[in-house]
Amino acid sequence: MITTREDLVRYAKGMELLGEIVSWNCSNISISQTALEEALKAADLSTHVTPELPFQTAFNRACKNLGQKHLIRKLEEDSEFLYFQFTREAREGEYFTYETEGKLTLSKETGKIACTVPELGQAVQEELDKELPLRKGADVSKLLLKLLEHEAGLFPVRPQGGCYLVMKEHSAFLDSLESFTGRVGGCLLRYPIPSGTRSGDQSVKLTIASALSALINEYSNSIDNFGSDTKPSTLEKAADHIRVARFKVESYSAYLEDERSKLDDLLVAASERLKEKVSAIAAGV
């Protein structure tokens, strides 16, 4: 019987884990791209998952830095440029008034700004140049998700995201991820799930099954949209998706128990649907 904290510690040290619930807090992070890559290297993680910050994302942050006095609306875009209208909002007596300030053009290739009001364009360009080399909490969160998806195969614990199940086989990878998150000013939260508890085993099974079911259904729904204009490469990719899903089901079969047969049925249905589509396209139907 566990009656003291020491008993609990001894029990925890000897228990076998199913996996961990993982979440993180990156809200106050602001770090350069160079420092981010150095932190990845120091934690023995890949630096190939850190794409450049899109100009429009940096532009949105730059505009936010200008304060609330400007209303900014995208007018249009083409292959080379994005066009925005800046409107000044001011309170006069009982009402707000709005005055068009100018039209701003952002180059998708260079990030350079042109504006019908030069001083406004210069102010935005200065803020944009400050934001481009920085990576914020949202960028690091996306990076953590990409690393987890690529290395560990995470499963959402709740539909809204933000909390994920990572199996015990990837605990060493989580150690590296925890090290990286701390180096950049964030915090990785890890909650171990012991094996052998009814609620824990059941929750792990249903979490994995739900994620795999959603994945297979997503592939099936995309197959339903195939038609005569569908490229052969798209059909091949759909077949690859089904093969990957089948491999994942097999890989996690030890945790799935009775849920395995339901997922197998979904895979069979998706495969049959793809065969029907391929035959129909070949026949010109």
What are these regions (language model features)?
Residues 1-2, 22, 145, 250-253, ...:
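Replication-associated primase and helicase/ATPase modules
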Residues 2-11, 18-70, 110-124:
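Active-site helix-to-loop segments that bind/position phosphate- or nucleotide-bearing substrates
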Residues 14-16, 156-157:
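Short, flexible turn/loop "capping" segments at secondary-structure junctions
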Residues 30-50, 57-64, 134-138, 142, ...:
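Terminal interaction module
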Residues 51-115:
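Low-complexity, serine/threonine/proline-enriched polar segments
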Residues 104-123, 201, 205, 224-225:
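Basic, amphipathic alpha-helix used for nucleic-acid engagement in HTH/winged-helix/SANT-Myb modules
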Residues 120, 213-285:
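C-terminal accessory extensions appended to soluble enzyme cores
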Residues 121-136:
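Extended, non-catalytic structural segments that build the interaction scaffolds
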